[in-house]
UniProtKB/Swiss-Prot annotation:
InterPro entries for the chain: Ribosomal_uL18_bac-type, Ribosomal_uL18_bac/euk
Name of this protein: Large ribosomal subunit protein uL18
Residue ranges of coiled coil: none
Organism for this UniProt entry: Delftia acidovorans (strain DSM 14801 / SPH-1)
A Pfam family the protein falls into: Ribosomal_L18p
């Protein structure tokens, strides 16, 4: 029987395979208890085109009023930032890779903020 972490990693691997077959850039999300990370990876998976996280110094100063980086408000901020950076890099359409995490809470907030800021997925 697989542990919860092994199940999540298996789902993530299967998702990456499906996204690679689509031939579009991938918006990859990873979350920890303290931070949330997002990056836009090229179609072939070799280059990171844009990235944003709550661990960045500039973001931490913006989060001063909100609190730590492990909440929905911080995920919303990262969603907007990654969409702006992706559009600056010339990426409009992506496939959402939630890395096996449930589409709920911080992951959902990041995705919705990125959509509102102009990314299509």
């Amino acid at each position: 029987m697989l542990t919860k972490k092994e199940q999540r990693l298996r789902r993530a691997r299967q998702t990456r395979i499906r996204i690679a077959q689509q031939g579009v850039a991938r918006l990859s999300v990873n979350r920890t208890n303290l931070h949330i990370y997002a990056s836009v990876v090229s179609e072939d998976g070799t280059k990171v085109l844009a990235s944003a996280s709550t661990a960045e110094a500039e973001v931490r100063t913006q989060l001063g009023a909100i609190g730590k980086g492990g909440n929905v408000a911080a995920a919303t901020l990262i969603g907007k930032r990654i969409a702006e950076k992706a559009k600056a890099a010339g990426v409009e359409k992506v496939a959402f890779d939630r890395a096996g995490f449930a589409y709920h809470g911080r992951v959902k907030a990041l995705a919705e903020a990125a959509r509102e800021a102009g990314l299509q997925f």
